[in-house]
Every structure is written in C-alpha cells, then in structure tokens.
C-alpha cells in the first residue's frame, strides 16, 4: 500500500502540479516503484504468477521454476521496460488502426453521414436521442475528444435550425461519447482492462455495449431533466455541417468501418464458445488486430473514394492519424508499465 500511495502521489503531483506529460509521469512513477519494490514482494509475485499460469495449463513445473529463477535476476529498470513492451504488444496495433479508422471517417465525411442518418431516423423532435446514439456509435472507433468536436457544430446548427434545446444536445453527446469511450473496445481504456484481466475482447465488446445501453439511458433522462432546469444558448457558428452533403459517402460505407470490427470479433468469440467446426475462418478473422486492420483498410478506401485518390491528402490523413494514435499508445503502455510494477 505504501508503494501504491507513493506511485499515485508521484503521478498526480507531476501531472497536476508540475504539468508534466502523462507519459513521463507514469514512467517516472513506474521506475521509482520498481526500484523500491523489496525482494520478498518480487518472489511472492513470481510464485503467484507461475501458479496461475500452471492452473491455466500455460506453464509446466520446469518452465515455472525457470521463470522464477530468471525473474529474480531481472533489474528494476528492465522490469519497467518489459511491462512497457508488453503493454505496446497488447494494444499498439489496435489503437493505431482505431486512430486511422477515426481519422478516415472524419476526413471522408463518413462520420457526418452517420450522424445525419441517425438524425433522419429519429426525426427532428428527437434530436437529443439521435445525438446520444451518434455519440455512442462514433466513440467506439473515434476518440471522445474528436467525437465531441465533430458533433458540437452539428448540435449548434440543429439548435438554430429547429429551435431545440442546445444544452440537451450537448449533454446527450457527452453521455453517449463518454460511455462508449469508457466501456467498449477498441478505445484504449476498456481495451487495456480487457487485456490486463484476461477477458476476451469480443466478450468485452458485447458486455460494454450491454452496460453502455443502460448507462446512456440514464444519461439521457438526466440530460432531459438538466436541460429543463438550466439554460444554454448556442453560439453563432459559420460552419454549418448539415448543409454540405456532397462529399459524404453512402450510408452502408459510412457505417461499415464501425460495424465490421464488432461483427468480426464477435464471430471469433462465438467460434471459441461453440467450437464451430468448419468455420475456422471466423477464428482467424476474429483476431482483434486483424479485425481492426481490415476495418482500417475499409475506412481508408472510403477516404480514397471521397478524395478521388488524392495521394497527398491520403498521406497527410494517415500521418495525422498515426501521430495522434502514437501518443495514446505510449501513454497506455506507460500505464501498463506502472500497473505492472505495482502488481510486482
């Protein structure tokens, strides 16, 4: 508990007070905790880890003994590096692909198309509910801050066009976006949780969607109540994203990058549960890295079509996506390193 308190104090102090980048704060905290961990705790961790691996059939007695002997010789800094590398291996490709999917959807107009379709389905009298669903769907492949900045101008335009409650729209966007971002992979938080506790990624998706539906329902009713109690006027924005639909792809191609990974990973999960003979392709395509990779290629194709094969734009969009994704990867991996040395 002392090392946990020390590590958390270092992270919070560096991030909140000294405004240090979260990556550096987490690595510094992980290093301090690693060097401060007593040998007794390391032996206990190695014993518990090897026992759990033997119970799962992943280790034999000889390999467990070899692991404990090798682990005792690992230096504190190398343990940090190993945990960091393990975190990258677990989530690196998935986050990179998710970043590319999100960027391609934004640049191609697919994200705006998704919003427009949902609004048309619900009707202008239930725009708040439409924003709730839009935020939830888009925040699965797209990071929450991007979803927020995408939807807010549309909410402003809808408030001016229909005279609707702007605060209701904003709260619905926040409720839908935050719940998907917190509960449904491939967003980094739930993805890392699934990897750390050994939960199948497909099961995490299904469970996150189920819990998310419940929580966003509560969020919607709170938004309805709060929007009647408080008032918020929409700002004037010249960017009306509802008026320009010429660049938008088809409805099917707009939804495909979001739906495809869920279907593929779910198929792989069902294959593992029911042992479907003759359908091994479901297991192959259900690999989370491959599923996100295929979806990223679909999203990239949608962008390619929307920009008529403009190579410079494709290159810039990809570079921007991987730049933003890389930051998330190293922060997530640093968090894995910090969590790993705390467990040790």
Task: Report residues per predicted region.
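Membrane-interfacial loop-to-helix junctions in multi-pass transporters
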Residues: 1-2, 85-92, 118-133, 161-169, ...
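Structural signature of hydrophobic alpha-helical transmembrane segments
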Residues: 1-4, 89-91, 143-147, 209-213, ...
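Membrane-helix interface "capping/anchor" motifs
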Residues: 13-24, 160-168
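Short helix-coil transition sites and intra-membrane helix breaks within transmembrane domains
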Residues: 17-22, 88-92, 102-112, 138-152, ...
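Core transmembrane alpha-helical segments of multi-pass membrane transporters/permeases
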Residues: 27, 52-112, 136, 285-344
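Long, contiguous bundles of hydrophobic transmembrane helices that form the permeation core
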Residues: 37, 41, 206-317
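Inter-helical loop and helix-membrane interface segments of multi-pass membrane transporters/permeases
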Residues: 38-79, 161, 191-203, 227-244, ...
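Hydrophobic transmembrane alpha-helices that form the pore/transport pathway of multi-pass ion
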Residues: 119-203, 207
């Amino acid at each position: 508990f002392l090392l946990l308190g020390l590590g958390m104090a270092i992270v919070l102090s560096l991030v909140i007070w000294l405004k240090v980048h979260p990556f550096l704060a987490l690595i510094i905290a992980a290093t301090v905790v690693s060097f401060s961990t007593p040998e007794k705790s390391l032996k206990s961790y190695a014993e518990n880890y090897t026992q759990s691996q033997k119970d799962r059939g992943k280790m034999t007695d000889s390999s467990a003994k070899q692991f404990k002997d090798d682990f005792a010789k690992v230096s504190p800094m190398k343990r940090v590096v190993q945990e960091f590398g393990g975190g990258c291996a677990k989530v690196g490709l998935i986050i990179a692909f998710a970043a590319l999917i999100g960027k391609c959807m934004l640049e191609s107009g697919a994200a705006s198309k998704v919003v427009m379709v949902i609004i048309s389905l619900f009707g202008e009298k239930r725009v708040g509910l439409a924003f709730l669903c839009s935020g939830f769907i888009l925040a699965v492949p797209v990071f929450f801050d991007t979803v927020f900045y995408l939807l807010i101008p549309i909410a402003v335009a809808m408030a001016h066009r229909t005279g609707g409650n702007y605060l209701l729209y904003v709260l619905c966007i926040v409720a839908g976006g935050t719940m998907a971002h917190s509960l449904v992979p491939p967003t980094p938080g739930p993805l890392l949780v699934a990897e750390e506790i050994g939960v199948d990624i497909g099961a995490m998706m299904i469970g996150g969607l189920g819990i998310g539906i419940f929580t966003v329902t509560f969020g919607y009713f709170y938004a309805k109540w709060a929007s009647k109690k408080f008032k918020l006027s929409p700002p004037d924005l010249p960017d009306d994203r509802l008026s320009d639909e010429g660049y938008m792809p088809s409805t099917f191609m707009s939804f495909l990058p979001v739906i495809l990974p869920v279907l593929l990973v779910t198929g792989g999960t069902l294959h593992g549960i029911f042992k479907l003979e003759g359908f091994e392709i479901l297991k192959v395509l259900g690999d989370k890295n491959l599923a996100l990779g295929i979806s990223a290629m679909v999203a990239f194709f949608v962008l390619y079509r929307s920009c008529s094969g403009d190579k410079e734009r494709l290159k810039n969009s990809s570079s921007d996506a991987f730049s933003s994704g890389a930051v998330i990867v190293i922060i997530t991996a640093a968090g894995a390193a910090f969590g790993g040395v705390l467990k040790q």
